[in-house]
Amino acid sequence: MLRTIILKAGSNASIPSPSRQNKLLRFFATAGAVSRTSPGSIKKIFDDNSYWRNINGQDANNSKISQYLFKKNKTGLFKNPYLTSPDGLRKFSQVSLQQAQELLDKMRNDFSESGKLTYIMNLDRLSDTLCRVIDLCEFIRSTHPDDAFVRAAQDCHEQMFEFMNVLNTDVSLCNILKSVLNNPEVSSKLSAEELKVGKILLDDFEKSGIYMNPDVREKFIQLSQEISLVGQEFINHTDYPGSNSVKIPCKDLDNSKVSTFLLKQLNKDVKGQNYKVPTFGYAAYALLKSCENEMVRKKLWTALHSCSDKQVKRLSHLIKLRAILANLMHKTSYAEYQLEGKMAKNPKDVQDFILTLMNNTIEKTANELKFIAELKAKDLKKPLTTNTDEILKLVRPWDRDYYTGKYFQLNPSNSPNAKEISYYFTLGNVIQGLSDLFQQIYGIRLEPAITDEGETWSPDVRRLNVISEEEGIIGIIYCDLFERNGKTSNPAHFTVCCSRQIYPSETDFSTIQVGENPDGTYFQLPVISLVCNFSPILIASKKSLCFLQLSEVETLFHEMGHAMHSMLGRTHMQNISGTRCATDFVELPSILMEHFAKDIRILTKIGKHYGTGETIQADMLQRFMKSTNFLQNCETYSQAKMAMLDQSFHDEKIISDIDNFDVVENYQALERRLKVLVDDQSNWCGRFGHLFGYGATYYSYLFDRTIASKIWYALFEDDPYSRKNGDKFKKHLLKWGGLKDPWKCIADVLECPMLEKGGSDAMEFIAQSHKS
């Protein structure tokens, strides 16, 4: 999620004028028509593709009656009439830029009391105008199947991002904001929300070097723009290994007890002396699981986890640009610069948190890896060891899959396999189960809606309206969940349009979707897109189903956690609505949802066999989960290693020796120091995509995981369907978006006042209370 540095605001909205009400009534009539033609169950629209295509007007064999009943209007992406083509996207960007400029001119020249009172509100409207282009383009360039749309999105994103960075260093805007906040006659009439947002904006201006000389501000703009471009290039290439294949001598593989069936599928080089194992597809991974030759496994693993030299250079350039920007802002490191305003306020507290967690986990991790060490020692004819350091020294990352498989061959389990389990979890079952869960704990449900022609970027996209039992429609989720060529491989939650209050002076709603508050005022509906890459399987002629592994169920719950934050975090001002909050707080609602996804009571309610309708047995789930959770601490430690790598790439040593800093050397040295599953062979750091989006804040996943664990045990362990505790979580945390201090939110949810102020003691408390 891209966060706009500046521009956040809001104000008390009043009931619209009569002429404006008429326009809104026309809008809601259209929305009502969509609602009337909503299909039946959620399960059916995700599990029966022919039904979906039929009711959505995509089936050429539709009956005349069906075509009449489901007649569709024509529109653009997300019901924005501009977005029917790449040129339309460019036009929308230009129109938005013009609107932003007009609003800017008004703000700079309105010195009346009214102008001062609405200044923060107008900053937020300005931000919304820019973000509705920037966030939209962020989504399109990651997901849209049309290359022309992707190119247009990149162009528009660059243009708007540069304009935004210019505004972030605009001295006149900052000075007016300071005068508003420092004038008691004005500030006393502002809402608490406006004052909070105004202070955040002022901090963000200062973070952009607003008080520095013009040359420095111009340099800040250039660096920010370059970081954005280099970062996008970096993220676009993280899926690609360094080479398409790796050569393995035939004699090494032929004598490694590998399946002859597998070997026959491999090509050889011209001389016939080497197998050419592709670094894509299943073959290399199958060899990692079955090849007894460690040197072969090592070579394969290294190739699978490496990237090109060009990608390493992109990462190095990104890291150095960030260090230069931080230095320009008089900070010792990019981590210090980035952590301002976060829950963890400085790099030392972050590193202490990670180290505490590592120290609490390393013995458990070594104990989990002990079975691999024993099997490997036996193969190498070495004496067995129980010493932690010796275990960790012996077990390497290319051993994990091979010896895990060998262990289960020697110790066969009666647990069901992943395929058996997945037959109970069709995509439709899981989405329906999520809706039922949200209905019980939050009083909201997911309701399918037919899309207009042109509203989505693929015929496989489903629209879900989010319906509150008290307020009606409160948001929209576009679900792009099925596998598609060229689509991002990483699951993601994209904010397309934030929620915010709509003000009396606003009359044009052609490019947004609008909701109504219980008091009769109006708000911009939050619009988000959930993107996954689930693979349907053909089960009969012309019928396919998408069966989810439990890990994929967890992924979907995680992304829906973000979605609920976006829907329920409805503030007056868009820049603090939903997931527009501190980076080390934003993962908390989504990680909490992972606990629900692992709960047997939830899973037995969702899991229904696709053929018989039989409910999955709790014992079946428990046996399977026990067989797959045996390396939990190892996974936690691996996440901690990545968090420490992120800190290492953004600490003070970069700027002090910038010409000689080597990202791969730094990565491998850290791996050796941290001991667990040491990788001192690959340049995997060049494939760590989160280094761009979560630069200096990747610790957020672990940090929020420890907090989510405490919240789960406090609120939902006894009853995951508790409406009382669901309301408590919604009231004290979700509804605030980024307005309320995150530490205060957590303290209120846990009824733990000592956490309210945050700081080192609170960080230490969270780290020590980690439960794996």
From Swiss-Prot:
EC number: 3.4.24.59
Swiss-Prot/TrEMBL keywords: Hydrolase, Metal-binding, Metalloprotease, Mitochondrion, Protease, Transit peptide, Zinc
Consequence the record notes for mutating H565R: Temperature sensitive; abolishes proteolytic activity for RIP1, but not for COX4
Cofactor (UniProt): Zn(2+)
Cofactor note as given: Binds 1 zinc ion.
GO terms under biological process: intracellular iron ion homeostasis; peptide metabolic process; protein processing involved in protein targeting to mitochondrion; protein stabilization
InterPro entries: M3A_MIP (IPR033851), MetalloPept_cat_dom_sf (IPR024079), Neurolysin/TOP_dom2 (IPR024077), Pept_M3A_M3B (IPR045090), Pept_M3A_M3B_dom (IPR001567)
Resulting phenotype, C581 to S/V: Affects protein stability, but has no effect on peptidase activity
Further remark: Present with 2690 molecules/cell in log phase SD medium.
Protein name (database record): Mitochondrial intermediate peptidase
Organism for this UniProt entry: Saccharomyces cerevisiae (strain ATCC 204508 / S288c) (Baker's yeast)
